[in-house]
Amino acid sequence: MKYRYLPQTDQDKREMLETLGISSVEELFADIPEEVRFKGALNIPEALSEPDLVKYFTHLANKNVNFSTHVNFLGAGVYQHYTPSTVNHMLLRGEFFTAYTPYQPEISQGELQAIFEFQTMVCELTGMEVANSSMYDGATSLAEAAMMAAGHTGKKRVIVSRAVHPEARGVLKTYAYGQNVELVEVGINSDGVTDTAALEALVDENTAAIIVQYPNFFGNVEDLGAIETIAHGKGALLITSSNPLALGVLEAPGKLGADIVVGDMQPFGIPASFGGPHCGYFATTTKLMRKMPGRIVGQTKDENGKRGFVLTLQAREQHIRREKATSNICSNQALLALAASIAMTALGKQGVQEMAMMNLQKAHYAKNALQAKGLEIVFTSPFFNEFVVKLNKPVAEVNKGLLAAGIIGGYDLGLDYPEFANHTLLAVTELRTKEEIDILAAELEAITRA
């Protein structure tokens, strides 16, 4: 039982030593002085059998706090949502169980059709004309959008709101450095949204794009109409990073003038799973379509007039024209795009709207419940399913108290925004019940008054 997996047999070892012209493994370390070599047996436990190994790691895993053992109010970019049971059932089918789009699409019509439907649903949600077959995650989608804007406009200045997810801004910074793109951050106002007055002062004719998040990192809904006017008034593109579920109740960015809409499909059928893997989406206009990174599935007809699906506009991609490609990315997240596609299909258009509305309504109930307990809600702007609460103690201390009560608390904004020390970002999804929200309010009141 203990020796189920053997990297090499004694015969293998003898043959390797003979090939090397030595008689023992010790001779491989002849360059290391004898006096500093370790001799004897290592002070480590003996190998475990497979059942004992499984039991050991199960014991370690049970020490973790997770969504099954605790009530979760943590979001900040990764959320706990309902996943229809059909998602995993379909993902594990042999026809679909691959992480990649095929290079011989004519033999993978089912998978290509599923990805085509993914693109179609992304376009419906975002109000855009064309979408690709997915990106790695929301952060890389955002960074790729900025580089696409710089390449299309020929300008090297990008303005990004501080209300965009801090980790996404970090990825953007890495991309910008390599492409010699200047990044300028614009602050937020007292309402927790992008300061449009400061933005207008920063934008000039050398600006390639303005990037905002909708809803933003604090959960608040940005005024895309006002920002669109500022961007297009100076010839810049408007890029929005949007939670796709929120677009079930919010006006589509495309209808508000966005040129590129990106985001993370995690709310649809993709588990939190320690922060990844995820699936980014990327949507734009037909005018910008040939500048878009990633793979695109198109619909066509074969010589018999039957509908078929192909990978189209491949000359944009790295595996065709490396030096002239639109991006270094010529991959995608096909399996997770399929998960999102199945989840959206299972929910349906009305189901997505209802799920989004439940998030909005339950988050607003939570805000009112906390206010009734004397807790301070920082911003008054319209929000989706997250909001900021000011505490009178460090967030880590409060979260420790919540954990003892069986609750996973919010995100510590002070980690990324020094001005928001002792501020927590709470997320409330459709899975939270009235009773759970009431318990959160009572526990927060007790902890902050202790």
From Swiss-Prot:
The keyword Ion transport does not apply. It comes from the Bacteria. It is an enzyme of class 1 (oxidoreductase). GO terms for molecular function: glycine dehydrogenase (decarboxylating) activity. It catalyses: N(6)-[(R)-lipoyl]-L-lysyl-[glycine-cleavage complex H protein] + glycine + H(+) = N(6)-[(R)-S(8)-aminomethyldihydrolipoyl]-L-lysyl-[glycine-cleavage complex H protein] + CO2. One of its GO terms (biological process) is nucleoside metabolic process. The keyword Nucleus does not apply. SUPFAM superfamilies: PLP-dependent transferases. Pfam families: GDC-P (PF02347). The glycine cleavage system catalyzes the degradation of glycine. The P protein binds the alpha-amino group of glycine through its pyridoxal phosphate cofactor; CO(2) is released and the remaining methylamine moiety is then transferred to the lipoamide cofactor of the H protein. This is Probable glycine dehydrogenase (decarboxylating) subunit 1. It comes from Brevibacillus brevis (strain 47 / JCM 6285 / NBRC 100599).
